Amino acid sequence: LKELVKYLSEEFKGEKNFNPIYLLLQICDKFPLVVINENLCIVEYQIGADSMSQGIYKQYVNSPRSFAKMRLQEMTLKHNTLYDRFMSAIHYVSSCIIANERNWLRNATRKDLVVIAAPLGWILSIYVKRKVTKIL
């Protein structure tokens, strides 16, 4: 587990944080899961400008490469529907545009979906950038 966290922190060097869901998906892929029926942690969610959900647009801009990686992975998950994969493709294109990733199509796992989703991804990237500008 330590090696995986170290690898991910090196892979996303320069980003303020990488998406925790991507880390969880990587762990689920590499290690067996144990199913238990008990609470392990109780979390109080922050409300306001500092909360994670309120700052999600900032996270998209601050860590676009980790979001793009997560979307790539989501496009390959067997349990995802075509709709889910298409939505992931839109978000993948948006994250790549925000990250100034030039090889976004070459790196795509589902090139067909990514090409179709490209115009919507471009629109989403403009929307996210404008939301962040309004927040700041």
Place the predicted regions along the sequence by residue.
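Catalytic core of nucleotide-sugar-dependent glycosyltransferases
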Residues: N39-Q46, S53-N80
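Conserved nucleotide-sugar donor-binding catalytic segment
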Residues: L1-G55
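Sequence-level detector for tyrosine residue identity
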Residues: Y7, Y22, Y45, Y57-Y60, ...
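Generic secondary-structure transition motif, activating predominantly at the C-termini of alpha-helices
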Residues: L8-F12, C28-F31, M75, T109, ...
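Membrane-interface aromatic/basic loop that binds lipid-linked glycans or pyrophosphate carriers
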Residues: S95-L136
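Alpha-helical structural motif
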Residues: P20-L23, S63-F67, A89
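Short amphipathic alpha-helical segments and their helix-coil junctions
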Residues: E3-S9, S66-K78, E101-A108
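Active-site-adjacent helix/loop segment of glycosyltransferases
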Residues: K78-S94
